[in-house]
Amino acid sequence: RISIIAAGPIFNFLLAFVLAVIVIGFAGSDKPYVQGVIDKYPAQEAGLEKGDLITSVNGSRVHLFREIQIYMAMNPGKSLDVTYVRDNQTHETTLVPKYDEANNTYYMGIYSGARYGLKWYETLQYSLYEVKYNVVTVIKSLGMIFTGDLPMTSFSGPVGIATTVNDMVEEVNTSMADESFSDRAMTMFLTLANFVVMISANLGVMNLLPIPALDGGRLLFLLIEAVRGKPVPKEKEAIVHIAGI
């Protein structure tokens, strides 16, 4: 029974991985290379240069440029110990992001996010990194909601998701209006597939949380049964699930 209920979340993660393989196989991945530094910003003052590959931030290994961005978003203004590779040599530096009052955010002063083509085995590897990134992000976001650092409105329901999909479709059609239909169709497919990677990974995590009426809640009762050696009375379990709904 545990394996049957756990199959749902596991399928969510598998779907996210398969779609990530397709997206990364066609579009590459955003390796954390520095494409450029901004004058008079902390990154330049700390010695970072175009072409550097950032490998860790404050001891946490990074494989995607987005991991740096999300770390800074969740730790605004925090000093960063950055490890990077230049000419096959590892270097370390420390910097404090600069606050931009106009945008109400902190910046290192680097830009990147370009997607780099990968070999087939790297595609599998970076697809795992992609799923891991989405899983870790949703877990940390949930933690920030419980601590009050993130509002509940940050999460979208079905209407919000539908609106996001519509916005993505319109963006592709507008930005590629002069491109061929096949190019627009491929870009739209990869864009939507990448979005489904995020949704599937998020659903996998949410369905494993011990929330009544969800898979995680049912798994919790089965684990209690396994420990006790007998099931929780059906009436009591039903009350908990109804309350959860």
Model-predicted segments: where are they?
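Juxtamembrane/interfacial segments flanking transmembrane helices
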Residues: 30, 154-157, 209-222
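Conserved PDZ fold ligand-binding element
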Residues: 43-65, 131
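Functional transmembrane alpha-helices
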Residues: 99-203, 220-242
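Alpha-helical transmembrane segments of multi-pass membrane proteins
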Residues: 12, 16, 198-207
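Divalent metal-coordination and catalytic microenvironments
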Residues: 8, 207, 215, 240
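PDZ-domain C-terminal substructure recognizer with occasional recognition of PDZ-binding tails
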Residues: 49, 55-56, 69-112
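Internal alpha-helical transmembrane segments
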Residues: 1-33, 243-244
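Alpha-helical transmembrane signal-anchor/signal-peptide segments
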Residues: 27-44, 49
